[in-house]
Amino acid sequence: MTASFALVLLLGGVAVCIATGVFGGYSEKANHQANPEYLNLAHYATSTWSAQQPGKTHFDTVVEVLKVETQTVAGTNYRLTLKVAESTCELTSTYNKDTCLPKADVAQRTCTTVVCESLRGDKFVSSFECAAA
């Protein structure tokens, strides 16, 4: 009887975790605009991605962070939905979020990126995709 009760509790806990997105899935961060870490990750992803694009002459920069979702694995995956635009900074310069501002009258794109951060703090951009302007 005790083993059956323990099994019911275990299965109930797993069901709650799955239903709330805690167990392996992404969970949306409601207060993402109040957390500067997410904006820093967005700038990291955008500048890293744009620097790797062939034929590109200027960094892209973040206009707005629209949505943040996190997934805990062996570290944390951050799935960020962003508005980006080409910046005034050439790729031959060093990217700085405070000085690399969006060019005037350029199209903004909505992009989704995933930044993976290990338990040691190492991070990399695992994907970066944009919809047409």
Swiss-Prot record:
Domain Cystatin: 29-115
SUPFAM superfamilies registered for this protein in UniProt: Cystatin/monellin
Superkingdom to which the source organism belongs: Eukaryota
Localisation per UniProt entry: Secreted
Range of residues in the leader sequence: 1-19
GO molecular function, one term: cysteine-type endopeptidase inhibitor activity
The keyword Transmembrane helix is assigned to this record: no
Main location: secreted
Gene Ontology CC: one annotated term: cytoplasm
UniProt keyword annotation of tRNA processing present: no
PROSITE patterns in alphabetical order: CYSTATIN
Tissue specificity comment: Salivary gland.
Keywords: Protease inhibitor, Secreted, Signal, Thiol protease inhibitor
SMART domains from the UniProt entry: CY
UniProt induction comment: Blood feeding does not affect expression levels.
UniProt-listed InterPro entries: Cystatin_dom, Cystatin_sf, Prot_inh_cystat_CS
PANTHER family: CYSTATIN
Family the entry assigns: Belongs to the cystatin family.
Annotated function: Inhibitor of cysteine proteinases. Inhibits host cathepsin L (CTSL) and S (CTSS). Modulates production of various cytokines and chemokines in lipopolysaccharide (LPS)-stimulated mouse dendritic cell. Suppresses maturation of mouse bone-marrow-derived dendritic cells (BMDCs).
Protein name, UniProt field: Salivary cystatin-L
